[in-house]
Design a protein with these regions (language model features):
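N-terminal small/polar loop signature for handling phosphorylated ligands or for N-terminal nucleophile
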Residues: 84-147, 246-305
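Gly/Ser/Thr-enriched, mixed-charge loops and adjacent short helices
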Residues: 31-36, 40, 148-280, 284-286
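Conserved phosphate/anionic-ligand binding catalytic regions in large, soluble enzymes, centered on
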Residues: 36-56, 140-141, 227, 231-243, ...
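Phosphate-binding and adjacent anionic-ligand microenvironments
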Residues: 287, 291-293, 314-316, 334-519, ...
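Short Gly/Thr/Asp-enriched flexible loops that form oxyanion-binding sites at enzyme active sites
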Residues: 95-104, 147-153, 302-321, 357-360
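Glycine-rich phosphate-binding loop plus the immediately following alpha-helix
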Residues: 153-183, 321-344, 349-358, 427
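Short glycine-rich or small-residue beta-strand-to-loop segments that form or flank ligand, phosphate
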Residues: 82-88, 226-229, 405, 532
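An N-terminal, well-structured beta->alpha segment
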Residues: 2-100, 107, 188-190, 195-224, ...
Length: 557
């Protein structure tokens, strides 16, 4: 691509959006290069990028072009193509959703769109419930406010496969961003009936499916749990509080500053429940209210973070791994106790999620399926079970990045489901005088202590992209040890190991049941390092983990 020529073409043609036109005129040479050095990547996760002017940005033109490519793909593969659309609270999410709807309508693709912002799992659900050909969710999940994205689902409600993404990308690449995109007015589409709002019955059906995930099976528990909840200025407020209240959890305090949708995320610039800064305000509320449980969902409400009180009365944040294995153990224990465990039960987790999950699953007679990073691969496996007539065999799926799913009603992680099941689990143990931290200690005593940590390193711009590629190649060198732990084996998933799709992921198996995984993020300009350390206790594990991190960071030079 001739960057200068493309920039000038945008100056001449990108006039419909005043903000884009104005920004183009302010760009210096360095910013022009970053905005135009490539087209925004379209993959299994759809689009994700910084909002702004240029081919490497999220704007009405890149969204419209992607929508045109998807429309062309749908028309080739479906006799009567249709799409379900949703959007979150991010800056321009509603605008991008309506632009996409207008493009689909102009191409004869029937559009069903949520009338208000909704969690991402409701798009997966609506796609399945309404039997649409595809689903689109405008979101950038837990990224900072400058980002937005465009997530695509297949007819099964699962994020598109690698093959489908390649076919859609091929259609997109045929298009000129200004000359080849058909558009239509959103409001005119609603009036004509080409664009229809998704009815409330679909939302109610979604909430009912979440409620059906309960594993109490008639057992009585004390539901008077003091809960502090934060939707982190996203989409979770109504569905999470509605579900909890309908199931008897009414003692809920919502973090006021983070209650209403706001794509600027004024109280937490990085609205990710994985990081303590995003949970800080909720922790303050929990202390003031003397809450039993703190819950927070990310802006598109597919991740859940929690905090509980320890014996000293101080609040502790639990990791996604810890919450996931607690939920897995609780669900399995309840199913076994009540005779509700299905035939040939299955648990699905990602390769970067703690291996203790597999030990717990084995204890209860579950088969574990390990998949690549990304909940779409968990959804894909649920789909395979469904095709075999065995959807009920699926018991639980989770990933270390705070994503959980207890049923097959959607094919993506569900923060509404996660929030509800965490509350139920908390109440169940509290009724017996057991805290979640007590239960966690019990699991460590049974299966051995394991520390799992995640370290992220940011690399912005075109230079950063090249740097990440260089670092990944450096890690493929003949590394003998990390932190004094010998490398027993290197698993390079770029070769498609264990029947999994090829992926830019390296996993070093170290001695003493330790490991380190290195991969670039699929949604942000970051390299991620996942470390797992088995040891006698937390102190010993933290010491080893620190040494492994030091050695790993040497390869960033």
């Amino acid at each position: 691509m001739d960057i200068k020529k493309e920039y000038e073409r945008w100056l001449a043609n990108a006039t419909a959006a005043a903000d884009v036109a104005a920004e183009l005129k302010t760009l210096d040479d360095a910013k022009i290069e970053d905005a135009f050095y490539r087209d925004l990547d379209f993959g299994t996760g759809g689009l994700r990028g910084v909002i702004g002017a240029g081919t490497n940005r999220m704007n009405i033109y890149t969204v419209a072009k992607a929508s045109q490519g998807l429309a062309d793909y749908l028309k080739k593969n479906f006799a009567e193509p249709s799409v379900a659309i949703g959007y979150d609270s991010r800056i321009k999410s509603d605008v991008f959703a309506k632009v996409a709807a207008g493009v689909f309508a102009a191409n004869g693709v029937k559009v069903s769109i949520w009338p208000v912002l909704m969690p991402v799992p409701t798009v997966s659900f609506a796609t399945r419930y309404l039997h649409t050909s595809a689903g689109v969710m405008v979101t950038a999940s837990h990224n900072p406010s400058k980002y937005n994205g465009y997530k695509v689902y297949g007819a099964d409600g699962c994020q598109i496969t690698t093959e489908a993404a390649a076919e859609i990308l091929a259609e997109i690449e045929k298009l000129d961003i200004f000359a080849d995109v058909k558009t239509s007015d959103f409001e005119a589409g609603v009036t004509s009936g080409n664009i229809q709002y998704i009815p409330d019955e679909v939302y109610t059906a979604f909430v009912n499916e979440v409620k059906n995930q309960s594993v109490l099976f008639g057992e009585e528990v004390n539901k008077d749990v003091a809960i502090v909840y934060s939707p982190l200025n996203g989409t979770g407020l109504k569905p999470v509080t509605r579900t909890l209240k309908e199931m008897g959890y009414t003692n809920i305090t919502v973090v006021k500053e983070q209650e209403q949708p706001d794509g600027n995320f004024p109280t937490c610039p990085y609205p990710n429940p994985e990081i303590k800064e995003a949970m800080a305000l909720g922790m303050e509320y929990a202390k003031k209210c003397n809450a039993d449980l703190l819950l927070a969902t990310d802006p598109d409400c597919d991740r859940v973070g929690i905090a509980v009180k320890n014996k000293a009365g101080k609040y502790e944040l639990l990791t996604g791994n810890q919450t996931g294995m607690l939920l897995l153990d609780y669900i399995c224990c309840q199913r076994v106790k009540h005779g509700k465990m299905p035939t040939d039960p299955v648990m699905i987790k990602t390769i970067v999620t703690m291996d203790m999950g597999e030990q717990i699953a084995t204890h209860y007679g579950l088969r574990t399926i390990n998949v690549l990073t990304g909940f779409k691969f968990i959804g894909e496996q649920i789909g395979k079970l469904e095709k075999q007539g065995r959807a009920d065999s699926y018991v639980f799926g989770f990933e270390e990045s705070y994503g959980y799913l207890t049923g097959s009603y959607v094919r993506d992680k569900d923060g509404v489901d996660g929030a509800y099941m965490i509350c139920e689990m908390f109440s169940y143990y509290a009724t017996k005088g057991i805290s979640l931290l007590d239960k966690l200690d019990e699991l460590y005593k049974t299966y051995g202590y394991c520390l799992n940590t995640l370290h992220s390193y940011e690399f912005d711009g075109s230079a950063g992209f090249a740097k990440m590629q260089s670092i990944m190649q450096a890690f493929r060198g003949n590394i003998k040890a990390f932190g004094g732990k010998k490398v027993v084996k290197l698993l390079d998933y770029a070769y498609g190991l264990d029947g999994l799709p090829k992926s830019e992921v390296l996993k070093f198996l170290l001695e003493d049941n330790c490991s380190i995984v290195v991969r670039p993020s699929g949604t942000e300009p970051k390299l991620k390092i996942y470390i797992s350390v088995s040891a006698e206790n937390r102190e010993a594990a933290e010491k080893v983990e620190c040494e492994i991190v030091k050695d790993a960071e040497k390869w960033f030079a």
